[in-house]
Amino acid sequence: MKKLFIETLGCAMNVRDSEHMIAELNQKEPYELTQNVEEADLIIINTCSVREKPVAKLFSEIGVFNKYKKPGAKIGVAGCTASHLGKDIIKRAPSVDFVIGARNVSKITEVVDKKHAVEIDTDYDESTYAFGEYRTNPFKAMVNISIGCDKSCTFCIVPATRGDEISIPSDLLVQEITKAVATGAKEVMLLGQNVNNYGRRFGATEEKIDFTGLLQKISKIEGLERIRFTSPHPLHMDDAFIQEFASNPKICKQIHVPLQSGSTSLLKVMKRGYTKENFLGRCEKIRMLCPEATISTDIIVGFPGETEADFEDTMDVLEKVRFEQLFSFKYSPRPHTEAAEFEEQIDNKIAGERLTRLQTRHTEILDEIMDAQLGKVHEVYFDELKSNGRVSGRSDDGKLVFVEGSEELLGKIVDVRIIKTSRGALDGVLV
C-alpha cells in the first residue's frame, strides 16, 4: 500500500480540505497515512497565504522534503498559496510535481499523476460535489457550508485564492452531518469564510435559507449533540442570529467575532462594513442574551495609517469585551490586495511594540478569566486520548479540559469539576 504524508498549514478550512483530499485519493487507490516523510510515496503541503510567513515556510518545507523523500516520491502543493502563485511554485521549486488550488481539491486524483499539473481555477464550483468520507477525529466532524468569500477587505487575499462565495445546499449538508453522526460524531463544526452570510448565493439550486435557518435545520438531526461554527462576520450578526445562538441548546456557547481593528476610521479603510460602536453593540447583545458565552476575535496591528489613537481604540474594545481568546498579528502586506499599495505603511518596530502591548494586556485578562474557572463544573465532550493516561475534550464554551482517564471516556459528554487552571487549559475531575 502506498503511503501519504500531508502537512496542513493555516485555518480549519484547510484542515477540512486536507481531509477531502485524503478521502478522494483513497477512493482511487488505498493510501496509508504516515508522519514520516522519508517513507511517503506522496507528499502534499496544504498551504496558507493569509500572511507572508506561511508562504515563506512553504518553500523551506519543499526543500526539506525534497532532500529526504525517497526515490520516486511525488511532492504536491495545495491550498491558498497554490491558488495565488500557481505555476510560479514549480518555477521556483522544480521538485514540485503538481499544484492544486483551494477551490479545486476535488480534482486531486486528476492531477496527482500529471507531471507539473496546475489546477487553480477560483471560479470552479465544488458546492455540490460529493466528497468521499474521511475524518481526522472520529468523534467530531468538520463540514464546509460554503466556499469562497464575497467580501473585499483591503488586507485580505482570500477572495483571490478561494473565489466568490457559493453556499452548499442545506440538504447536502444534512446528509453529510447525518452520515458523520452515524459513524460516531456527536459534534459538528460548520466552516465558512463568513458562515452567517450563508444562503446569499447557491450554485445549482434556488434554495431560500439563511444561516439561522440552517442552524435550526441541522439542530433537528437525531444524535447530533453539539454545533460549533467559524467564522461569522460582525456585519451579518442580526438579532435573529444572536437569539438563535443564545437559545438553541445544541449550539455551543463559543463564538468568534473578528474585530480586526477597534478604530472606526481604519475599519472603513479596511472595508469591514461596521463601526466600533456596531461591533461593541453586537458583543453586548451576545453577553446580554448569553452571559455564559465565550467570545474570541482576530486583531491586526500596524495596518497602514494606524495612529496611536487608532490603536488605543482597539485596546478599548479589548477592555470592554474581554475576549477569552485572541488571534493577533502584525499587518502583513499581501499580493492582490488594496492595502499592499497604501502609502502609509507602519514601521515594523512600532507595529511590534503595539502587538506586544495588546498581547500582554490580553494575557492579563485571560489569566483572570481562567482563574475564575476554579471549582466550576463544565460539561466536557472528550475526543482525544493522550499518551500520559489523560483524556482531553472541550467544554460547551470551548475551553480545553484534561482529566485522568481512559478511552472509555471518548465520545462521551461528562460533567467535570475544575481543580487546576492555566492560561491554555483546565484540569478537572469527573463529577
Swiss-Prot record:
InterPro entries per UniProt: Elp3/MiaA/NifB-like_rSAM (IPR006638), Methylthiotransferase (IPR005839), Methylthiotransferase_CS (IPR020612), Methylthiotransferase_N (IPR013848), Methylthiotransferase_N_sf (IPR038135), MiaB_methiolase (IPR006463), rSAM (IPR007197), rSAM_horseshoe (IPR023404)
Main localization (coarse): cytoplasm
Boundaries of every Radical SAM core domain copy: 135-368
Binding site for [4Fe-4S] cluster 1: C11, C48, C80
Keywords: 4Fe-4S, Cytoplasm, Iron, Iron-sulfur, Metal-binding, S-adenosyl-L-methionine, Transferase, tRNA processing
SMART domains per the UniProt record, alphabetical: Elp3 (SM00729)
Disulfide feature: none
Names of required cofactors: [4Fe-4S] cluster
EC number(s) reported in the record: 2.8.4.3
Entry-linked PROSITE patterns: MTTASE_N, MTTASE_RADICAL, RADICAL_SAM, TRAM
GO cellular component, as recorded: cytosol
Domain TRAM: 371-431
Keyword S-adenosyl-L-methionine listed: yes
Record localization: Cytoplasm
Occurrences of domain MTTase N-terminal (ranges): 2-117
Cofactor annotation comment: Binds 2 [4Fe-4S] clusters. One cluster is coordinated with 3 cysteines and an exchangeable S-adenosyl-L-methionine.
TM helices/strands, residue ranges: none
PANTHER family: CDK5 REGULATORY SUBUNIT-ASSOCIATED PROTEIN 1 (PTHR43020), MITOCHONDRIAL TRNA METHYLTHIOTRANSFERASE CDK5RAP1 (PTHR43020:SF2)
Function: Catalyzes the methylthiolation of N6-(dimethylallyl)adenosine (i(6)A), leading to the formation of 2-methylthio-N6-(dimethylallyl)adenosine (ms(2)i(6)A) at position 37 in tRNAs that read codons beginning with uridine.
Record family assignment: Belongs to the methylthiotransferase family. MiaB subfamily.
Protein name, as recorded: tRNA-2-methylthio-N(6)-dimethylallyladenosine synthase
Protein species of origin: Sulfurovum sp. (strain NBC37-1)
Gene that produces this protein: miaB
